[in-house]
């Protein structure tokens, strides 16, 4: 009927033309039935002829009127009405206007006007009256714009839809009334905001949303929505009507739906529909267009209805049920819509209820109708959309780019020849299918064959050539280009999926072209290549991208490696390999641990030898498979990768794996080949080239902020792009970087010129999210940042390449800016190290941060990763470490060191940064240059130059042996394998130059750090001379160990800081000596002595090797230089810690203070042996670290000694386990370049800080809270590291990050190494107590534990190296060795198992916010082992680390472990006392710590410890930093700290607020859990606060594992307490909190074996029957509550602090309760027996959570000793372990019995 058709037509039409009313349309279509009918109705009284004429007039008039006026529509009717019935026009108007064509219905009866009479008129009048009644506006909008008619269009569950009219445009609209929602104020506000946002959405495929308001209907409130009126129904009704949808229609409509979704997802912020289904997809009949509707309903329905009611189960993605979802839920729903369209069958129609659907959806079972899809292409697309794992789903962009949805251009492009996947050139054929669609004239049968080079050609260029050749008209060029692109893109994707075959040639060509240019900066260059290749890579399926992202997430370190692997396969072997190499050492570890297990079968040999190597081998294998030309690549890229492999295998070979190393590289034949080629040719040449090419860039990057440089971004920055944290203020440089064809926009907000080299950028993502992140120009690799961005879906995989390019450009610009800035700064500040460092700290928090960054590099102080942005690049830091593994990074770091010591330090931290620093140093110093070159050449030079170095140095033989072994391993060991190699070579060169003065120093350089140190010495001849006595010795010893790349990054950072502090350098050097010893061990797999520290999380063999190394090193070092050197070489982690400390120390006078703190810590640990001797040195450094470089250095050295001693006792096993579990994060960041430096395994360690935080705290997803929390953690961890060498290795990474974040970086660089170390120690303390470092604290959270460990090791090493303390240290080393041996047996196996489990668990728990803590636990174990001798250092470090990583359970557990180990290793309360003293020292002031430590800290330590605890507890906010370092720190440092504190306070506050909220909820949940736990476990301890029990429970499980790990090292030495602490990172925060978190962090990591070991150890060592059951019970309970408790615990624990996640809770607790946790550690150490690790954590588990005010009660630790270690921060009575303890009352009670008087 005319009316029927007319009605829809009118509505449809009204929708189409915007302001044209129904009437308006009618006149235009005067011939239509609708118009005629209407006219008939209106003109029934007129005669036929007259009617016609009248009609025309009226129509025209009405048209005009309608447009202008509401009256227009009624005009025809009005005329008619006037003639027929004198009905007032006003009355008619509404009806006409509203009713439009519906009048036709009423007028139908009058078929001819001639027949119509007055009677008809009357009838008509009556009908019209009825119509009017219907069409009268029954309601109007508050604004009066919209009218509602009483015409119901539809009714749903929650809404009724009426017809309405927009009086402004005369377009009919839909008036939707939603039933009463009973919305809360917050919900109402949210809906208002969403409505305002929806009003602005205008898109052809989105139903227009006009307005909304609240109204009262029938006495009830309702929400009214006015939307566009869709006339042809929904997709659902269409399917019901037509059953089968034609493929063409399906393609067209699906494409329109995708365009609409893309529009929504690209808004800022992104709009997620959440209820997409066929019922909400509307069709506009006339045009066949499709629009997505019901946008505002998802939120409204969500608010007031049960979750099961919200959304449509059939279309709801699995994550929707958990309410943790993103845009991918709409992709899932789209897939289900497409499935329904393809099958006309409702998805999951086989299920009877929503519960069945839920079970199927969450278990990944596809709907039954999925198998009914006939079109394979459609089926593939649907499958890609409805994958259970959201990260594997295709993205909207991928779908739109899919050939199936490509719009028909009338052209067809096909392959003329089969694609062999090997040739980059494709033979394509193009012909015209539909000439009508083209504007030009074409012959239908004419086909154009042409070649297309995937590498160089672009579709636009080819199309343009065709136009020029006359094949097509110019107007068709876009269509031609689109057709070519649509055909080439899938080919690229398939090749990316099969990189072995497809990309071989491409890679070869790239290797030749890019590899030659970038082999030197392989790190950086390759990342560039990957970025470029990302173009192709980005086109790979979303699934592939997501898999890669997941891998990256799992292992931040692996980030790079996994990316590199993918990139390699997708883009070019060279680029992939490069990124791999740069990140491989660290990646190798993390990757090997996380991915290694996956690829174990693939590379068993490599894995056995070195987890890192495994990965690299695998990668290499992949590369080889991918490219036969990989051999060429292997030369360029393999040097890096191989160095990784070599470094890893070499690390083992040094002691046991020498041959293994060789064979390891051979894991894959290509690898072996690469080794020889790369070694001699690629590395030497590439390294030199890198040095030459990278030096300028490196210098620039070191000196330039990551402003907006494009040039330098390419190679120097990429590898080290992760280093810096966002904390540093960045100079705003508006540098919008919309990438070509990318949907993201990158803008530079500011570049920091205060020495941290931080650049703050804002990224507008493809889905219109605004992501603000900061990164270190030198320390963060753009690839790493890109990986993280891709992983978080901020950047599409397809955009990654462009993103990296833009980042590189930014980095280059920033480097230029910084280069200029630092050139002047160096001129004024390098010489005046002290002054510069002060100003740096005070004036430029950024500089401090820079230092931190450099420290971070080696330490993987990716705690930055923890800043919620991740954008900060917590993850990036990990990645950066990976990248730093590559030689270019090393070179960069080296070169940068001389020129820009203040800045390089932080940069050094990141491997890349280190490389740049080194490069700078090389530029400035010939020796450095040589070093750098040798580093680049790594293998050749390592062999030749390392020997030289060894000969030059006193400990030449040992070093030579180690170095030679390390030569192979060294490059790999270093975060960048090339880097490490370069370092080694550089060391020899430097050795020659500085042999007399700093021969040791040069040896330090063999690793990255060694080179840095040498550079620093070179840069500061005077300083180096001062320290030459001790420094040289230390360096010599360090050099070999340093050869272990593990410490090179830290060393580089140190070198940078060393510029002003040779002493620090020496310190670093001595640990470095250990590193070479550990070089084999550096590799996560290799647990050589050198790697012992770094390997301690990696593998038990490492411990054994470490022991052997310790012995051999001891002998060699004694013969060569000092007995202490062997210890330091044994524990590269100590070196790393020292380095970490150095960087911060050199920051300023305060930095100097930091160094004393570190020394104090070391002294405390070594107090038994060297505490008297160190005391003066320590004091000196404390009082004037900068001025007394030489004096300070000895102190530092002695500290190192102690650390080494401690390491010796515990590291073998603890280190091994820690490394094993942490993927080498705990032990040697450099030793485990992949694990430590890279993000994966190290991710646990430093990833804890970066990735750890990121992953650990899913709740930290809030970028702000996460970032601030991470910063706080980082700050505290930093202080911890500074105060305790104990955490030296972790400290290096974290401290570097911390320093950079703390604005210590700038000054530390110029400062002497010692000064840097002091600063670092001070920073550590600050991080512990200073709120300024809170932000950093965040960043450093997990890494802190590592840092703390490294610091303790480093301190011990320093002590060992201290000339005055040689004998004492030697004895201590022996003790440590014995202890280590004791610990080693038990720890080794548990740790090894722990390492992988821990890594995996950590990865998982990181996501849960507790994985990191587990890592921390691992680290803690490691630290504990080291801390046996360095008890004072350990406690302080532990506290600080706990403080710093309060949130990071890692730190907590590590601290506990360390404390325990101190007790066991020290085997005397003095260890405890030392721990206390160290704590007090770090908490109060370096000076205080120094003296106490020097005094052996047995007597003073308790007091000092308590004081330190208090200061630490209070100092998490920053009081601690001021307390610890105020005395020694310069005013500049104070100012800087204050500035940093204030800088991040707001973020912290926000984060705390959010976290508090979450914690509150968790608290309640945990409370109930705790109550149940308390009931189940009866303990003498007072019940812990509710959240404590839960986290305690969840952590209990972790704790047993941690205990197991620690047990291995602590079982014999009664390090149960330490283990407890280690296991309870939260406990570290606040004793109770630390304890609680520890278990959580360890929970994921611990295996049943570990639990058994812990139980057995408890039986043997403690002899406490209760403990054993406790562990089992705890294990079980933790297992039960693991999933929920983990997050809950983490969240509960931080509830007081307001942190969102476990990490956060740990952090917050650490802030207030770090002292508590440390006291726990103290008490634990004091109790020789292994008190139940669980027990003690219970005690502190939540006591300190509330804040620093809670005294640590050791009830949990020792039921008898319910003493409250009075941590000033914990002003309260005893630690109330009740909350925590209740979780495991038995264990904790028993443990307390075991260790009644633990804390003092």
Swiss-Prot record:
<feature type="modified residue" description="Phosphothreonine">
    <location>
        <position position="541"/>
    </location>
</feature>
<keyword id="KW-0963">Cytoplasm</keyword>
<feature type="modified residue" description="Phosphoserine">
    <location>
        <position position="1638"/>
    </location>
</feature>
<feature type="region of interest" description="Disordered">
    <location>
        <begin position="1060"/>
        <end position="1086"/>
    </location>
</feature>
<dbReference type="InterPro" id="IPR024678">
    <property type="entry name" value="Kinase_OSR1/WNK_CCT"/>
</dbReference>
<comment type="similarity">
    <text>Belongs to the protein kinase superfamily. Ser/Thr protein kinase family. WNK subfamily.</text>
</comment>
<dbReference type="GO" id="GO:0106310">
    <property type="term" value="F:protein serine kinase activity"/>
</dbReference>
<dbReference type="GO" id="GO:0007231">
    <property type="term" value="P:osmosensory signaling pathway"/>
</dbReference>
<dbReference type="GO" id="GO:0141109">
    <property type="term" value="F:transporter activator activity"/>
</dbReference>
<dbReference type="GO" id="GO:0035556">
    <property type="term" value="P:intracellular signal transduction"/>
</dbReference>
<feature type="region of interest" description="Disordered">
    <location>
        <begin position="1571"/>
        <end position="1600"/>
    </location>
</feature>
<dbReference type="GO" id="GO:0035633">
    <property type="term" value="P:maintenance of blood-brain barrier"/>
</dbReference>
<keyword id="KW-0597">Phosphoprotein</keyword>
<feature type="modified residue" description="Phosphoserine">
    <location>
        <position position="1585"/>
    </location>
</feature>
<dbReference type="InterPro" id="IPR056865">
    <property type="entry name" value="CCTL2_WNK"/>
</dbReference>
<dbReference type="Pfam" id="PF00069">
    <property type="entry name" value="Pkinase"/>
</dbReference>
<keyword id="KW-0067">ATP-binding</keyword>
<keyword id="KW-0723">Serine/threonine-protein kinase</keyword>
<feature type="region of interest" description="Disordered">
    <location>
        <begin position="707"/>
        <end position="739"/>
    </location>
</feature>
<dbReference type="GO" id="GO:1903078">
    <property type="term" value="P:positive regulation of protein localization to plasma membrane"/>
</dbReference>
<dbReference type="GO" id="GO:0072659">
    <property type="term" value="P:protein localization to plasma membrane"/>
</dbReference>
<dbReference type="GO" id="GO:0006468">
    <property type="term" value="P:protein phosphorylation"/>
</dbReference>
<dbReference type="GO" id="GO:0070294">
    <property type="term" value="P:renal sodium ion absorption"/>
</dbReference>
<feature type="binding site">
    <location>
        <begin position="227"/>
        <end position="230"/>
    </location>
    <ligand>
        <name>ATP</name>
    </ligand>
</feature>
<feature type="region of interest" description="Disordered">
    <location>
        <begin position="1431"/>
        <end position="1453"/>
    </location>
</feature>
<protein>
    <recommendedName>
        <fullName>Serine/threonine-protein kinase WNK3</fullName>
        <ecNumber>2.7.11.1</ecNumber>
    </recommendedName>
</protein>
<feature type="region of interest" description="Disordered">
    <location>
        <begin position="1465"/>
        <end position="1496"/>
    </location>
</feature>
<dbReference type="GO" id="GO:0140693">
    <property type="term" value="F:molecular condensate scaffold activity"/>
</dbReference>
<dbReference type="GO" id="GO:0005524">
    <property type="term" value="F:ATP binding"/>
</dbReference>
<dbReference type="GO" id="GO:0004672">
    <property type="term" value="F:protein kinase activity"/>
</dbReference>
<keyword id="KW-0547">Nucleotide-binding</keyword>
<feature type="modified residue" description="Phosphoserine; by autocatalysis">
    <location>
        <position position="308"/>
    </location>
</feature>
<feature type="region of interest" description="Disordered">
    <location>
        <begin position="834"/>
        <end position="868"/>
    </location>
</feature>
<feature type="region of interest" description="Disordered">
    <location>
        <begin position="880"/>
        <end position="912"/>
    </location>
</feature>
<dbReference type="GO" id="GO:0004674">
    <property type="term" value="F:protein serine/threonine kinase activity"/>
</dbReference>
<keyword id="KW-0832">Ubl conjugation</keyword>
<dbReference type="GO" id="GO:0010765">
    <property type="term" value="P:positive regulation of sodium ion transport"/>
</dbReference>
<dbReference type="GO" id="GO:0005737">
    <property type="term" value="C:cytoplasm"/>
</dbReference>
<dbReference type="GO" id="GO:0051928">
    <property type="term" value="P:positive regulation of calcium ion transport"/>
</dbReference>
<keyword id="KW-0991">Intellectual disability</keyword>
<feature type="region of interest" description="Disordered">
    <location>
        <begin position="1"/>
        <end position="25"/>
    </location>
</feature>
<dbReference type="InterPro" id="IPR000719">
    <property type="entry name" value="Prot_kinase_dom"/>
</dbReference>
